[in-house]
């Protein structure tokens, strides 16, 4: 059967199926409905079979048409190919006749290709420019040569010991499946000039011992700064500098010496510090002389951002900052970064200030110990004499003042109030502040009560009487609080007069 007859048969079968469905919806007897249902199923199967045969007929027709088209193309392509061959032959003949130029030496081309093949896979020390502008050298491997930039030959390298995500080779790129290309977080190879390459540095861990600084390989394939805590049986237990990384047990190929020697020197100098109380809670603090003599190393500038995303230096660069120069419009501002001060946990600012004063005094004593001793002796003598004389007078006069003037709520003795010490002044200030807060709070309550009384005047006698009682009680409380505030102010004046009389 051809395509048209099959389509006509499908149309008639569908019309019969519609008639059967109409008969079923008419509500005939049960026996007739069973016959109609069987007829409906038969018609549906028949329609499916004819549709499948129609599809097979269409496929066979399409295949036949494609075969005819391919045979026609092959017949027409033969004269075209012969014409193209003739044109190429004429072109090559003209080139052979007109070429008087010197032919390149094939030996030199072969040598260049051999050199390019030889350099691929070699281990070198390649430069890496960080996002904050510093230049570092890392061990790397040459992957392939790149197009030269002018006369400079260039190669693509992958770093062997990546210290950042941007240095770690992208696994999908190596397989040719990376979809991000230039926007990938990982490295697709660094293109560097051949003149910038250095000799490969072998990792020598023979001198490393417990407590030595190193670079250790983490589970994510990145090498982080760490410190060796234990060496046993060829295995190294390392503790990473970052608190987010756990301890790890690695073999010898999992650690290398640090890239910069200042890490080692800083570790040795930190062990030799004596003042544990002050240095345990603070970062390094420079004295005035050290700040004058301090020189800025541009290679280490913004070095702290090796462990961050480097947003600070990026913002500076966007605002026009030039690396190594001063801040400001005229580049005359500060060059060195601000030293971070880490305060000890759980201590007040007074204790922190005492620690800083103690540290600066210790630094001054190291520079000039004789003058420090003289000042300490003078201070002891003056404090001892003043303490002995005035303490006796204050103890005698203060007891009387306490019994006469101080109320039961006062927590400061008369001698302390009259002496006017730091702790006394602080406690008086706190009490005065609390009293003032209470006074303002009670005044607000009185204002609210008066407003509510004015609104309910003549409406509800019980509510009005209740509000009047509250108003009277709050007014009495206000008088008491004001009296307490005045008493604290008198104590403050007493301490101030003592200070004026004792300072000559």
Swiss-Prot record:
One of its GO terms (cellular component) is nucleus. Residues 95-121 are annotated as: Disordered. It holds the Pfam family G-patch. The keyword Metal-binding applies. Disulfide bonds: none annotated. Residues 308-354 form the G-patch domain. GO terms for molecular function: DNA-binding transcription factor activity; DNA-binding transcription repressor activity, RNA polymerase II-specific; RNA polymerase II cis-regulatory region sequence-specific DNA binding; sequence-specific DNA binding; zinc ion binding. It comes from Danio rerio (Zebrafish). GO terms for biological process: negative regulation of DNA-templated transcription; negative regulation of epidermal growth factor-activated receptor activity; negative regulation of transcription by RNA polymerase II. Residues 107-118 have a biased composition (Acidic residues). InterPro entries: G_patch_dom, Znf_CCCH, Znf_CCCH_sf. Its main location: nucleus. Transcription repressor that specifically binds the 5'-GGAG[GA]A[GA]A-3' consensus sequence. Represses transcription by recruiting the chromatin multiprotein complex NuRD to target promoters. Negatively regulates expression of EGFR, a gene involved in cell proliferation, survival and migration. The gene is zgpat. This is Zinc finger CCCH-type with G patch domain-containing protein. It is found in: Nucleus. Keywords: DNA-binding, Metal-binding, Nucleus, Repressor, Transcription, Transcription regulation, Zinc, Zinc-finger. The lineage of its organism: Eukaryota, Metazoa, Chordata, Craniata, Vertebrata. A zinc finger (C3H1-type) spans 165-191.
């Amino acid at each position: 059967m051809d395509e048209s007859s099959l389509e006509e048969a499908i149309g008639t079968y569908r019309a019969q199926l519609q008639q059967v469905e109409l008969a079923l919806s008419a509500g005939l007897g049960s026996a007739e409905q069973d016959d109609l249902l069987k007829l409906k199923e038969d018609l549906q199967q028949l329609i499916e079979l004819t549709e499948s045969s129609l599809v097979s007929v269409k496929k066979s027709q399409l295949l036949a048409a494609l075969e005819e088209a391919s045979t026609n193309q092959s017949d027409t392509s033969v004269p075209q190919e012969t014409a193209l061959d003739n044109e190429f032959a004429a072109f090559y003949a003209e080139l052979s006749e007109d070429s008087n130029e010197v032919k390149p030496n094939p030996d030199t081309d072969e040598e260049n290709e051999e050199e390019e093949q030889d350099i691929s896979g070699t281990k070198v020390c390649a430069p890496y420019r960080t996002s904050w502008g510093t230049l570092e050298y890392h061990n790397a491997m040459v992957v392939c040569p790149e197009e030269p930039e002018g006369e400079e030959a260039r190669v693509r390298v992958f770093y062997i010991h990546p210290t950042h995500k941007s240095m770690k080779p992208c696994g999908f790129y190596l397989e040719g499946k990376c979809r991000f290309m230039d926007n990938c977080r990982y490295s697709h190879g660094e293109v560097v000039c051949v003149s910038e390459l250095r000799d490969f540095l072998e990792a020598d861990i023979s001198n490393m011992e417990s407590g030595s600084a190193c670079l250790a390989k983490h589970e994510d394939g990145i090498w982080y700064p760490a410190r060796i805590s234990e060496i046993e049986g060829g295995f190294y237990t390392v503790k990473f500098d970052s608190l987010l990384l756990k301890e790890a047990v690695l073999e010898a190929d999992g650690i290398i010496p640090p890239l910069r020697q200042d890490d080692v020197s800083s570790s040795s100098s930190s062990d030799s510090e004596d003042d544990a109380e002050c240095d345990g809670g603070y970062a390094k603090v420079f004295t005035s002389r050290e700040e004058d003599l301090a020189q800025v190393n541009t290679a280490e500038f913004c070095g702290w951002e090796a462990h961050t995303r480097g947003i600070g230096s990026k913002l500076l660069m966007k605002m026009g900052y030039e690396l190594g120069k001063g801040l400001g419009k005229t580049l005359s501002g500060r060059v060195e970064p601000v030293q971070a001060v880490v305060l000890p946990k759980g201590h007040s600012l007074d204790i922190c200030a005492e620690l800083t004063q103690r540290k600066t005094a210790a630094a001054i004593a190291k520079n000039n110990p004789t003058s420090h001793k003289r000042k300490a002796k003078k201070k002891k003598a003056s404090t001892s004499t003043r303490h002995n004389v005035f303490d006796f007078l204050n103890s005698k006069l203060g007891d009387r003042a306490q019994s006469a003037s101080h109320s039961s709520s006062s927590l400061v003795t008369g001698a302390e109030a009259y002496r006017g010490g730091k702790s006394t002044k602080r406690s008086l200030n706190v009490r005065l502040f609390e009293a003032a807060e209470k006074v303002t709070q009670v005044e607000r309550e009185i204002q609210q009560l008066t407003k509510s009384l004015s609104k309910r005047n003549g409406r509800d006698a019980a509510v009005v009487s209740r509000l009047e009682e509250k108003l009277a009680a709050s007014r009495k409380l206000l008088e008491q609080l004001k009296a307490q505030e005045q008493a604290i102010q008198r104590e403050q004046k007493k301490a101030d007069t003592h200070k004026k009389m004792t300072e000559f």
